[in-house]
Regions:
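Extracytoplasmic c-type cytochrome modules immediately beyond a signal peptide or single-pass transmembrane anchor
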Residues: 1-119, 128-173
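Short, cysteine/histidine-rich loop/knuckle motifs that typically chelate Zn2+
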Residues: 122
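Short Cys/His-rich local motifs and their 1-3 flanking residues in nucleic-acid-associated proteins
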Residues: 125
């Protein structure tokens, strides 16, 4: 069966797909942190079922931040611009709405804010207040370049970046 699909149809479903993946990854991530004492080893995404399912469809789920846990690849110019827009909204207490961009003819990129939650304070909160000395030592040992702390509850910690192949969206229409 042949069906005409508009760019609007693709973008609408891609935004919905990004929102669903982000919501499920966030749910699984928080559940795994709450289930573990300390949570440090649970703060990785790669083994979460929602991330593995997305990966099997060619969808890449990742996080970016100006305050990274480990020294990784610096943000590119587009990532810096998107991050700056979300940071601007956060500083002015504006609603931060997930967005979708067309990277090229074959790929879409979904962005959404990562907001500091109470469950994250034991590793990302204030040292000596939320982060225990034991956890501080463990973080220093495992993540010597860690900058992802001193966040207040409700603060912008980073962004979800989900790269979605258009063909995956078209298959779903």
């Amino acid at each position: 069966k042949i069906r005409k699909v508009s760019a609007s149809d693709i973008m609408t479903l891609a935004l919905k797909t990004g929102e669903e993946i982000q919501a499920e990854v966030t749910r699984q991530h928080l559940s795994s942190i709450l289930a573990a004492e300390g949570g440090i080893e649970r703060c990785t995404l790669s083994s979460l079922p929602a991330v593995l399912k997305a990966k099997s469809r060619g969808i890449e789920v990742s996080r970016i931040s100006q305050h990274s846990r480990e020294k990784g690849r610096p943000m590119d110019s587009v990532e810096l611009e998107v991050y700056a827009a979300f940071k601007y909204a956060a500083q002015r207490q504006l609603k931060m709405i997930p967005s979708l961009e067309e990277v090229n003819e074959t790929t879409l990129r979904y962005w959404a804010p990562i907001i500091m939650k109470k469950a994250c304070q034991s590793c990302h909160g204030k040292k000596g207040v939320h982060i225990s000395p034991k956890t501080q030592k463990l973080l220093q040992k495992q993540l010597s370049k860690d900058q992802a702390f001193d966040f207040e509850e409700g603060a912008l910690m980073g962004l979800w970046r989900i790269k979605i192949p258009k063909k995956e969206i078209i298959k779903s229409l």
